[in-house]
Amino acid sequence: PVCQFSNQRKAHALRNVTLKLTEEVKMSSIAAPFGLNPIGRFDAGSLEVFRQYPIKSGESTAIVKGDIVQLVNASNATTIAKMTGTMDGSATDLCGIFMGCRFTDPNTNQLTFSQHFPASTVASDAMAYVVDDPNVLFTIQADGAFSNARDIYGKNAPVVQGTANTTLGISRVSLDAS
């Protein structure tokens, strides 16, 4: 049997969903930054738009899902690393947003797929999955309330680099609201 709703019931169901979504948005004052997460695109393309970039073996900083990564030129290769700045206009070779990685775990010698690349991991085959498409839209939590909420659209803003949650493999990058 197929469940069918009248137009009136559909409208009521949609109104309830809209109200619930609105209530959730209004209640989002919990300070729990999660980095940048892809939510859509400017065009009609797919959200499966990540590329692979090598991660430097022995990278001193952990990289987790939602972190902003930059290109790093080494003497023999170009790799990525977690961006440590605030993106306030300083010269940085921004690459994209880290979504996960694969590497051979030096402790188990097993190929590992993870949202988290541990700090100081020595793995010559480490590859990051990075969303680097300029048409992707992201969501990010701000670190506070904006003084003029109507004046935030279409603007650039610096970010705040929080300490990554390496247990869950989630970034703590947030948007600087000041």
Question: Which residues make up each language-model segment?
Answer:
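Surface-exposed, low-hydrophobicity beta-strand/loop segments enriched in small/polar/acidic residues
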Residues: E23-S178
